[in-house]
Amino acid sequence: MKMEMHQIWSRIALASFAFAILFVSVSADDVVVLTEENFEKEVGHDKGALVEFYAPWCGHCKKLAPEYEKLPNSFKKAKSVLIAKVDCDEHKSVCSKYGVSGYPTIQWFPKGSLEPKKFEGPRTAESLAEFVNTEGGTNVKIATAPSHVVVLTPETFNEVVLDGTKDVLVEFYAPWCGHCKSLAPIYEKVAAVFKSEDDVVIANLDADKYRDLAEKYDVSGFPTLKFFPKGNKAGEDYGGGRDLDDFVAFINEKSGTSRDAKGQLTSEAGIVEDLDELVKEFVAANDEEKKAVFARIEEEVKKLEGSASRYGKIYLKVSKKYLEKGSDYAKNEIQRLERLLEKSISPAKADELTLKKNILSTYA
């Protein structure tokens, strides 16, 4: 059983790695936000511009969002193209000027021109990219994000979901279900947020294809979300909101993780409450008393399990350095780590440095 489970997780890890190599990740960070103040500064000059005119409350705009968000990363190397958007609730005069009467409206502004051409095709990333390629003379293909959602089957369900070392969120979906399609891009982001957490799994099961398994877990509508924590493999219904922030807050609370919606560790990550109280005593004590408090920290760390045990070892290292180098050590080390975090480093390295920085802050 252990060998089978090891093989399954190995296959999942290899598949994720392969996807990461083959495809460029998707990000919405490079969509240029246009306003009444900057529209004509950004558009109509040395770049062709694809502009989405939208309203925050518009359902069709929300449906378009995950498709539109694929464009900026794909066109990142096409220096002659700008991917942008305008909030027509906030900047009505801009939208009125360019004849926008419904949402979303997507227009192409050629280089050196403020005379747009309206996009009339299907609202998919592929169709939008083809439109930009035709109008802008580029040859770009859509970058596809690697998926961190674990796809379940009857053969893998028990090994993955009932693994007592994992907290597992499962979406039971049907391919034809509209609400499932709307949830899909959000669910992908949830999986990406927690991809570095070894004991958290975000998974899904085609409940239309595997009806017997879905019925076993009382699935009667789609999507149905169930959480299988380490301590309750019977499963619990997820009844929270379906925005990214809702899912992230839920997993953080249930699994003891500390991630934000971008997948980065928060300032609370690594903090062990019982050790924090001892650190306060340690910092306030004189040199002789510090040694006695350090011995108590060592004893407390021995009691810790799981990720808390790993954090406890960082507390011990910091305490030793504090004894050797004095009270300025924590402040100086925090500044050094902050400089490193500003550089281009891997997510795993960023996690490592952030954990240490958070723990150091309790000594500063």
Swiss-Prot record:
**Has the keyword Manganese been applied to this entry?**
no
Q: Which family does it belong to?
A: Belongs to the protein disulfide isomerase family.
Q: Name one GO molecular function term.
A: protein disulfide isomerase activity
Q: Which cysteines form disulfides?
A: 58-61, 177-180
Q: What does the organism's lineage look like at the top?
A: Eukaryota, Viridiplantae, Streptophyta, Embryophyta, Tracheophyta
Known EC number = 5.3.4.1
Per the UniProt entry, the signal peptide is: 1-28
Question: Which compartment or compartments is the protein found in?
Answer: Endoplasmic reticulum lumen
According to UniProt, residues marked as the site described as Contributes to redox potential value are: 59-60, 178-179
UniProt xrefs under InterPro entries: ERp29_C, ERp29_C_sf, PDI, PDI_thioredoxin-like_dom, Thioredoxin-like_sf, Thioredoxin_CS, Thioredoxin_domain
What are the protein's UniProt keywords?
Disulfide bond, Endoplasmic reticulum, Isomerase, Redox-active center, Repeat, Signal
Catalysed reaction(s)? Catalyzes the rearrangement of -S-S- bonds in proteins
UniProt keyword Kinase present: no
Site described as Lowers pKa of C-terminal Cys of second active site, located at 242
Quote the cellular component terms of the Gene Ontology held in the record: endoplasmic reticulum lumen
Primary location recorded for the protein, binned into one broad class: endoplasmic reticulum
User: What NCBIfam families does the annotation carry?
Assistant: pdi_dom
Please identify the protein, giving its name as recorded: Probable protein disulfide-isomerase A6
